[in-house]
Amino acid sequence: MPRKAREYPEEGEFVVATVKNIHPYGAFLILDEYPGKEGFMHISEVAPTWVKNIRDYVKEGQKVVVKVIRVDPEKGHIDLSLKRVNQQQRKAKLQEYKRAQKAENLLKMAAEKIGKDFETAWREVWVPLEEEYGEVYAAFEDAAQNGIEVLKGLIPDEWLDALKPIIEAYVEIPTVTIDAEFEITVPKPNGIEIIKEALIRARDRANEEKDIDVKFTYQGAPRYRIDITAPDYYKAEEVLESIAEEILRVIKEAGGEATLIRKEKRIRKIKRR
């Protein structure tokens, strides 16, 4: 089970917890990411409406996402709230938790590979990477995209060698795909050839960049669709802007007209091989 490097959660943090026992006035929950730590959720923090029976909302053994509203390390008190977590926050926290589970499994594979127990792995790898990146899986994504060398100096070199093939095989990198359309006309006998040449040159130049993929699709005159896949939205936008400037320049010089029509971005994942 993934655990945080910190001993206590911070106020305002969303955590995954397991309902331990329920009382008429509230419930005690085990904080899954903080070993040995429990929190209390008063009945007034269960739902935004009046709660007659707390068991209508939570069950013993149930896993829930709750918000930490107060922490007193000296007394060991942690107050929790379920009603202050909306659906979007719950979804985001569960996604983060799943990423932590995957990172933990990959680290266990690396530990087994070099004959170390997970406590050592947690101390030598998990803690420094979480402190640097906020979450360990984000560190693994960075290594998958930019090379294991980005982790050098953060963790011992023996872990770099053990993690490299594991990250390459199992870590998925989020990529952003944006699409748009160009309306292009060149009123000349060889207008189609001029348009094709402009699109091909723009595409090939963009595809020379690392982790960039550009595709054009003919949609029927005068429309041409462009799909750009990049590591992040800002890079995709940068590439689109560069391509648009190139196409508009070439078409204008040829005596034609070109217009860019924007569409929405899409997010998908690719697996490093």
UniProtKB/Swiss-Prot annotation:
Keywords on record: Initiation factor, Protein biosynthesis, RNA-binding
Keyword Transmembrane: no
Domain of life: Archaea
MF-aspect GO terms: ribosome binding; RNA binding; translation initiation factor activity
Domain S1 motif: 12-83
Transmembrane feature ranges: none
Quaternary structure (record): Heterotrimer composed of an alpha, a beta and a gamma chain.
PANTHER family named among the record's database cross-references: EUKARYOTIC TRANSLATION INITIATION FACTOR 2 SUBUNIT 1
Record function comment: eIF-2 functions in the early steps of protein synthesis by forming a ternary complex with GTP and initiator tRNA.
UniProt record similarity statement: Belongs to the eIF-2-alpha family.
Name of the protein in its database record: Translation initiation factor 2 subunit alpha
Organism listed in the record: Thermococcus gammatolerans (strain DSM 15229 / JCM 11827 / EJ3)
Lineage summary: Archaea, Methanobacteriati, Methanobacteriota, Thermococci, Thermococcales
Gene, per the UniProt record: eif2a
